[in-house]
Design a protein with these regions (language model features):
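Expand to "…catalyze enediolate/carbanion chemistry for C-C bond making/breaking, isomerization
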Residues: 1-229
Length: 229
């Protein structure tokens, strides 16, 4: 699958331009798909907030055959109902099955005192949409930022114990019922391929702990991930 991101890669001042580019991208893909023998991945749009779901769909609704669904960043108790409701509104406007991929990365999961309750309530929100949930994702960098830490190129997310424990709690609650993908590895270039060695090391622990797949942010990462899974 591939994600077209309208969230943290886009400045507030550029949202309108990004939406126009999104529409143009789908037009280009539609023409390529119609005139060439090409295989496309499942294409998802990562929205900024629940309100943007309907705006995005209006832009690309005529390209239903290319579009697989939405990614919901910072899915939390504060916005889960709105995300779910807006998604169902879009779903009711199409005869095609769309999917959602919530990202668990919000501050309310970080607080250890409330984490168990929050995770259980979040699972209930996601269970309400179970037939439409293709994947549950996690925000490793957001969690690291919350603790004021960052893994280096020769370390894995599992070396950061507070984050590792948090990811473990998410897997404990969700992995028996959902596919949960591993967190982003932020390195994709270095001398002597240290970044690839580090990514392979982290992928080993991802698989060991029950993550399925890995979010990539650069084409260099794709063959490393594919070869390791």
């Amino acid at each position: 699958s591939v994600a077209l991101c309208l969230e943290d890669t886009i400045a507030d001042s550029a949202v309108g331009q990004a939406l126009e580019q999104l529409g143009n991208t789908f037009k280009t893909l539609h023409l390529a798909f119609a005139t060439h023998d090409v295989t496309l991945p499942k294409i998802f749009v990562r929205v900024r907030n629940p309100e943007q779901i309907s705006v995005v769909y209006q832009k690309i609704s005529c390209f239903d055959e290319l579009f697989s669904g939405f990614i919901f960043p910072k899915y939390s108790l504060a916005n889960a109902d709105e995300y779910n409701s807006e998604f169902l509104k879009v779903l009711s406007q199409s005869s095609k099955q769309f999917y959602m991929m919530p990202i668990l990365e919000s501050e309310d999961i970080v607080d250890y005192a409330t984490r168990p309750s929050v995770l259980i309530q979040l699972k209930q929100k996601i269970d309400d949409m179970k037939d439409h949930v293709l994947n549950v994702r996690v925000g490793g960098n957001d969690f690291s930022n919350a603790f004021g830490v960052r893994r280096h190129i020769d370390e894995t997310i599992y070396d950061i114990l507070p984050v590792s424990q948090l990811l473990c709690d998410i897997l404990t609650v969700f992995s028996r019922d959902y596919v949960v993908s591993g967190p982003v590895w932020e390195y994709y270039s270095s001398n002597n391929d240290e970044w690839a060695i580090g990514l392979k090391r982290e992928l080993k622990y991802d698989v060991l702990n029950g993550f399925v797949g890995k979010t990539v942010i650069h084409p260099n990462q794709i063959p490393v991930v594919v070869d390791s899974l």
